[in-house]
């Protein structure tokens, strides 16, 4: 009887099920809004290095700096299907294709010359408005890039395996599709010693697409870790200096952990992976950011800066 009385009192002390449900919904709404705000700000373009040493691939680089839009908060790849009707491409691919076509024109490019400069057009014509990569935007991008995609697909039989893989990379519309492509085309082939495939170039491009195109640096880092831990042969073939550069930039873009960056640089030194100019640019980005942090934020700031200086030496 005493136990029942105690239970009756404790039940009365709790709020009703309706108030519990409303309280749960209120807390769920707060946590959801907080997480979405944090995610959008974390993966915004503002967190990307403004002087990133690469664009998409080696043959897409033309020396122009990337101008970051300071007002962009939501990642553009979340709404990439809104501006193209009938055909969708990952964010960032259009400008890279423009640059690619300008450097490597196709045989029938003159017939479909929507991006060729026309001096007879008026000064305010969109065809005279240069993009920040120095190329003329096409008048009908949906049709232009749809036809271009068909042309690239038709060139597969005349292209190297790396070019074919790069074209497959550009067709990935989600990071999950990119992960599936990595699993089928790279990871499952790591045990094939006879396969004549430039593994380091393919891994570097896959990490770069994950890091810049889908703003998922942790996915890029997982690609690196999968190849590194697979076997000594896979590590030697795949983990070159450009791949380590992408790993360093992925760590800094994703979590800004200077100790992790130092760990990767130490791996390069121990395994005699020679640093290149891109490595020094990545270290300079890390050094500049750490040097601007408040002193109370990182107690070992001076020690980390001294170690980064050592890796900056030739």
UniProtKB/Swiss-Prot annotation:
Q: What does the record give under GO molecular function?
A: translation activator activity; translation regulator activity
Q: What is the lineage of its organism?
A: Eukaryota, Fungi, Dikarya, Ascomycota, Taphrinomycotina
Q: So what does this one do? A: Translation activation factor that as part of the MRH5C complex specifically recruits cox1 mRNA to the mitochondrial ribosome for translation initiation.
InterPro entries with a match to the protein in the record: Mtf2-like_C, Mtf2/C5D6.12-like
Subunit structure as annotated in this protein's UniProt entry: Component of the MRH5C complex, composed of mrh5, ppr4, mtf2, and sls1. Proteins mtf2 and sls1 form a subcomplex that serves as a scaffold to bring mrh5 and ppr4 together. The MRH5C complex associates with the small subunit of the mitochondrial ribosome.
The region called Disordered is annotated at 111-136
* GO CC, any one term: mitochondrial matrix
Q: Which Pfam families match?
A: Mtf2
Describe the outcome of a gene knockout: Decreases the association of cox1, but not cob1, mRNA with the mitochondrial small ribosomal subunit.
**Name of this chain's protein:** Mitochondrial translation factor 2
UniProt lists the gene as mtf2
What does the record list as GO biological process? mitochondrial translation; mitochondrial translational initiation; positive regulation of mitochondrial translation; RNA splicing, via transesterification reactions with guanosine as nucleophile
Q: What is the protein's species of origin?
A: Schizosaccharomyces pombe (strain 972 / ATCC 24843)
């Amino acid at each position: 009887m005493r136990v029942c009385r105690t239970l009756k009192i404790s039940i009365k002390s709790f709020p009703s099920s309706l108030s519990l449900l409303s309280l749960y919904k209120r807390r769920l709404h707060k946590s959801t809004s907080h997480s979405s705000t944090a995610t959008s700000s974390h993966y915004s373009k503002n967190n990307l290095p403004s002087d990133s040493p690469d664009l998409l691939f080696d043959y897409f680089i033309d020396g122009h700096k990337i101008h970051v839009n300071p007002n962009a908060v939501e990642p553009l790849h979340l709404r990439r299907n809104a501006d193209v009707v009938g055909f969708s491409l990952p964010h960032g691919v259009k400008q890279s294709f423009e640059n690619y076509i300008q450097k490597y024109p196709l045989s029938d490019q003159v017939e479909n010359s929507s991006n060729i400069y026309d001096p007879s057009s008026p000064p305010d014509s969109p065809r005279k408005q240069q993009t920040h990569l120095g190329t003329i935007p096409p008048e009908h991008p949906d049709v232009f890039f749809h036809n271009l995609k068909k042309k690239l697909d038709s060139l597969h039989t005349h292209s190297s395996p790396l070019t074919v893989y790069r074209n497959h990379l550009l067709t990935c519309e989600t990071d999950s599709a990119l992960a599936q492509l990595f699993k089928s085309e790279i990871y499952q082939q790591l045990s094939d010693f006879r396969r004549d495939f430039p593994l380091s170039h393919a891994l570097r491009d896959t990490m770069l697409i994950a890091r810049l195109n889908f703003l998922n640096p942790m996915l890029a880092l997982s690609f690196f870790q999968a190849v590194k831990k697979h076997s000594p042969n896979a590590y030697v073939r795949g983990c070159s200096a450009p791949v380590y550069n992408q790993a360093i930039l992925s760590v800094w873009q994703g979590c800004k952990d200077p100790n992790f960056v130092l760990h990767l640089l130490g791996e390069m030194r121990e395994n005699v992976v020679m640093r290149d100019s891109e490595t020094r640019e990545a270290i300079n980005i890390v050094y500049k950011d750490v040097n601007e942090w408040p002193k109370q934020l990182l107690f070992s700031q001076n020690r980390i800066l001294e170690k980064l200086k050592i890796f900056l030496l030739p």
